[in-house]
Design a protein with these regions (language model features):
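Fungal secretory targeting signals
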Residues: 1-26, 532
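Substrate-access "cap/lid" subdomains that shape
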Residues: 99-101, 197, 201, 208, ...
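Non-catalytic accessory segments of hydrolases
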Residues: 20-183, 448-461, 469-476, 510, ...
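Loop/turn elements at helix/coil->beta-strand transitions in domains of secreted/extracellular proteins
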Residues: 121-126, 153-156, 205-209, 230-235, ...
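Mobile gating loops/cap/lid regions near enzyme active sites that modulate substrate access
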Residues: 394-532
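Short glycine-enriched nucleophile-adjacent loop
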Residues: 218-230
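Gly/Ala-rich beta-loop-alpha elbow adjacent to hydrolase catalytic centers
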Residues: 213-217
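Alpha/beta-hydrolase active-site loop
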Residues: 110, 179-200, 254-258
Length: 532
């Protein structure tokens, strides 16, 4: 069983239901509109209410439709001389399960990015942000992911789209023989390549780029560090997750055959499958079963090009960007929301552990059954959600921190602020911290009922975060992480929200150290989707 539409949004820490509004980025008219000349075209944006320049929907690659469906991202076609690209509206959202009003309209011409920058400045630090959504959903037009708070503090903020689910990770037997078919990961690389080549035109320093993300966005950050050991990034932010967080992987062509049958195309064994599937309208993929279940089966394959099985061996061989300072951490109740997200399949804990979504095949089941007691939780679903939080978020962060912190400057946080920011469970759960790290203000515009106290916390969080982005090597204001048991920052602690308290990771990682971490070197294990 997969994601329901509203619950997909919960994974991103965004507003839902009646609390949701979807405003365009705030703007004002100030004389002539700002223009930036790029090799692909001149782009024209607008000034926001703080006189920052904003450019939305700039293509960083060609359309992914037609013959480019299931190809690596292709270069942007050159524009005619004198072309001025209108960058005042968000671009299309990449195709994904279910269509809705939260993001812009879906279209395969979706590899676009957004830039917020001060009106004046040069050689400014750059923060590139990647949204989350389990690699099956999400988009940079999410109203909580605006960059005004960074531009006001002389940091250029960039967000971008990637392909999702079946369009990003088809896991096809026809592909992957000579190059990676993890197209979503390749999209990330293309976006960062664009930033390196073009951000100076917006006043940014291509030699001072920090790449960060939340949930699957931070998994993408980690893939980039593993795939580019010599990267010029000066900092990385992994909020909640990393390369050991998943997603799960199905056998080659298994998921694609099931979807192909639904849309009237042959199986992989019959031949001509991709040729047929390339002709299917993107909305025709959105069958009821695809939207509720199948969409989660399409995830990055272990190709040992863009996703690896032996990260431990790569680290030992120096094939990881250990020179890049890393900020990582979690909210204090990551799993709470997942008791709802997977509520249709997690009320039987024993059965839940066998599902594709739980994705814990590498861990002996008896250990997992012994590690959780339903009397400690409000329901079996709540216990299953907590287990999911351990498996996907807390323990991967703990495991790779143990592995890497001896050779990589690493700082860890834990977010305690008890605010729901539109989520239907008490905070802080998965995604709660996002609008606080991004500084609130416009990032809170889509959520009703935000208090002055919440904005004060967002100001505090964003201030130290921006200071770290400007000088990652100096650290964020607390001690570096160490393996097993070390210092971490407690953020948003009740009664002392506008301060950073210190804690010890050893007070929180017991179940990771004893149950999960010993088996994470074996992750991922192929999972049969027909048994999900």
């Amino acid at each position: 069983m997969g994601f329901l539409h509203g619950l997909i949004s919960l994974l991103l820490g965004i507003c839902i239901g009646a609390e949701c509004r979807n405003p365009r980025a705030a703007r004002q008219v100030v004389g002539g509109a700002p223009r930036v000349k790029l090799p692909q075209a001149t782009v024209e944006g607008f000034f926001d209410l703080h006189n920052n320049t904003v450019f939305l929907g700039i293509p960083f690659a060609a359309t992914t439709g037609g013959p480019n469906r299931w190809r690596a991202p292709q270069p942007v076609p050159p524009a005619r001389p004198g072309t001025v690209f209108n960058a005042t509206q968000y671009g299309a959202t990449c195709p994904q399960a279910i269509s809705g009003a939260l993001y812009t309209q879906q279209d395969e011409d979706c590899l676009n990015l957004n830039v917020w920058a001060p009106a004046k400045g040069s050689n400014l630090p750059v923060f590139v942000y990647m949204y989350g959504g389990a690699m099956v959903t999400g988009g940079s037009s999410n109203p909580q992911l605006q960059g005004q708070n960074f531009a006001r503090k002389d940091v250029i903020f960039v967000s971008f789209n990637t392909r999702e689910s079946i369009f990003a990770y088809p896991n096809s037997a026809e592909l992957g023989k000579t190059e990676s078919q993890n197209f979503g990961i390749l999209d990330v690389e293309k976006a960062l390549e664009w930033v390196q080549r073009n951000i100076a035109a917006f006043g940014g320093d291509p030699n001072h780029v920090v790449f960060g993300g939340h949930s699957s966005g931070s998994v993408q950050v980690d893939h980039y560090l593993w795939n580019h050991p010599q990267t010029k990034l000066v900092g990385a932010v992994q909020m909640a997750a990393n390369a050991k967080s998943g997603p799960a992987v199905a056998p080659t062509n298994q998921a694609l055959d099931i979807v192909a049958t639904e849309v009237g195309c042959p199986s992989g064994a019959q031949g001509g499958q991709l040729e047929c599937l390339r002709k299917v309208n993107l909305y025709d993929f959105q069958t009821e079963k695809f939207n509720t279940t199948y969409n989660t089966w399409f995830t990055p394959v272990v190709d040992n090009v863009t996703r690896f099985q032996d990260y431990e061996g790569r680290l030992a061989a120096g094939k990881y960007a250990s020179h890049v300072p890393l900020l990582t951490g979690n909210s204090n109740a990551e799993g709470a929301i997942f008791g709802l997200v997977y509520g249709a399949e997690n009320s039987d804990f024993n059965a839940w552990l066998d599902t594709f979504d739980a994705d814990v095949a590498e861990i002996p089941k008896d250990l997992l059954l012994a590690a959780y007691n339903v009397s400690d939780y409000a329901s079996v679903s709540a216990m299953s959600g907590a287990q999911y939080g351990d498996a996907r978020f807390y323990c991967p962060v703990d495991y790779l921190r143990d592995l890497r912190s001896a050779s990589q400057d690493t700082w860890t946080y834990r977010f305690f602020a008890n605010y729901s920011v539109g989520l239907p469970v008490p905070g802080p759960t998965h995604g709660t911290e996002i609008p606080f790290f991004l500084g609130g203000n416009e990032c809170f515009d889509a959520i009703e009922g935000i208090t002055e106290t919440e904005q004060a916390l967002a100001d505090f969080q964003n201030d130290w975060f921006v200071a770290w982005i400007k000088n990652p090597k100096a650290g964020p204001g607390w001690g570096r992480s160490t393996p097993k048991n070390g210092t971490f920052a407690k953020l948003g602690v009740s009664g002392n929200e506008l301060a950073i308290e210190l804690g010890a990771t050893g007070d929180y990682n017991g179940i990771c150290q004893s149950v999960y971490n010993p088996y994470l070197p074996e992750y991922p294990v192929l999972l049969d989707v027909t048994a999900a």
